[in-house]
Amino acid sequence: MHQLAEELSDYYHLSLRDKLIYKSRIESVPSSTGTYISSESYFISLFVACIILLDIIDIPEKKKFLEGKSTFVASVLPELKAYQRFVNRLIGDGNSTVEESQFQSNCEEVVKVYKYAFETESDEYYERFEISRELKQKCIAASNGHKYY
């Protein structure tokens, strides 16, 4: 999460003050978020970094993100090297160099997880990554510095 947060702050050219605030908030995320026991933990880390950043730079976009209506995951994240490694490691075969078409397919899968967690209200279970319906609540809790279970 720290590498992704660093790249996001560079991508948005945050001022030194905002970088320090962002880094401090990222560091205040409970350590249980970064244990990566399940694939859900990876997605929590990814989405928490986005929520905290949007809280600093664009509150209306953060609101859209939390409602599942943002294009942030599809448009901004693929520009970042840390995200590319994340996607290729979690969804792909672990190879850091995959074809562009495979990378796009992997990114679409992350967008599906985002939509499942933040937009959909159904009780269905996202089987591919064993993601619970409480993913959104866990992300919000972690981004506010609270532990989630």
Protein language model features and the residues they cover:
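The feature marks long, low-complexity, polar/acidic/proline-rich intrinsically disordered regions embedded
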Residues: 2-149
